[in-house]
Design a protein with these regions (language model features):
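Tandem repeat scaffolds
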Residues: 1-125
Length: 125
């Protein structure tokens, strides 16, 4: 029941409204991947390019993002509690702010997210 997808092209794949369990995507090119309104459990994304993917209104449980490119990814209305994005690129990530409760990010990501949410970050204190 475990699926490994490695070194594959999933550019623009529409997996919206799907239910995914025990899946690993490794070193995949998956820009524009659509996982919106899906239920994802025990899934791992490792070294994947997921720029501009849509993961909005999605239930995530036991999901790992490791060394992924998530630039301009849409996580609107997807709770990220328990998700660690600290090893990923997340420039221009799309969300309202409430999704970030309980999400782990690096210090530099925290500064960028604060600015994205409209905070003015003062560098000299």
């Amino acid at each position: 029941r475990r699926v490994l997808i490695r070194d594959s092209k999933l550019v623009g794949a529409d997996l919206s409204l799907s239910s995914l369990q025990h899946v690993t995507l490794a070193s995949c090119e998956a820009r524009y991947l659509n996982l919106s309104q899906s239920r994802i459990r025990d899934m791992s994304f490792t070294g994947c390019r997921l720029d501009e993917c849509a993961i909005s209104q999605t239930a995530l449980k036991g999901v790992i993002f490791d060394q992924c490119q998530l630039n301009r990814a849409d996580f609107f209305e997807t709770p990220l509690k328990g998700i660690d994005l600290s090893s990923c690129e997340i420039a221009g990530i799309q969300l309202s702010g409430k999704e970030l409760v309980g999400c782990t990010v690096s210090p530099l990501q925290a500064i960028a997210l604060a600015q994205l949410l409209g905070l003015l970050v003062k560098e000299d204190w």
